[in-house]
Amino acid sequence: MHYRSITDLADLLQQSLHRIPRETDLVVGLPGGGVLAANILCLLANVPMSDLESILAGRSFSVGRTKLDGGPAPAAQHVVAVADTAEGVAEARARLAAAGIAATLVVVYGDGPDVPGADLVLEALPEPRIFQWSFMQHPVLERACVDIDGVLCLDPTHAENDDGAAYLEFLTTARPLYRPVRRIGTLVTSRLEKYRAETEGWLAAQGIAYGRLAMLDLPSQAERIRLGAHGSFKAETYRQSDAPLFIESENRQARRIAELSGKPVLCLETHSLVTRETLARAPAAAPVPSTLGTAKAIARGLLGPARVAALKRRFAR
């Protein structure tokens, strides 16, 4: 499976700017991710932007603040229409042609280097693939394993995560985060089994449909922490399923799940796809030094080891 983030999209458009016709004076975003791509491209190229329905209806497009004159926007002479994938490109070309609008059709990610109806493909990216801007709409959700906290809702704060009254309040009032538009195959959470009723109630209130809810069957939060069961439980549930993807909020757990299951994990903290191959190429980052450790390192650099040692002896008295 291939994954592309919004950062990947922006980088590709930046690197491909020289491939866009120089005479472009209007960028049109085709429905879906094409609108996002067009927004980025019009800012990079410093030209106005419109959407497909607006230009077909003859509505004027907005002029960017960087335009030198303040008069009305002139009729576009060279239109570039952008889609994130090939879906709908042929239809868009036909509709633009029927309206007498000549346009260069750009597909950001095509199945191959050539796409019917497109003049330019920026990157060949075969299926299966998933994008940051549409992962909660992707058909893979119907078979995927998905975390709850940090994905469907915000993580509890330290104060809320007390395994008591504050946590019960969190479970019923958690703020929604990413909203799926499809039924999720399996929800896999390290929430304790004793909180199933509250979890199911919140999911129902949010209108989130799913096939199965897997929860950690341990007596307490303290026992869960003692066993370090978060990642291993999720990994084993994922490994035993036929799910092709796990969506996890936290990088450390995503790496653990990918390592133990041998299957890909979409990490929302880094917006990257974690696999055994990526783990082999990029070992885990070194722990971030503590504030005290950082201060000591700065002091040694500024004062030198001898003066730092002298100060330590002085204040130890």
Language-model segments: what does each one mean?
Residues 53-59, 109, 217-220, 269-274:
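Short, acidic/turn-prone active-site loops that include or flank metal/cofactor-
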Residues 177-200, 214:
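Substrate-recognition element of Asp-dependent hydrolases with the DxDx(T/V) motif
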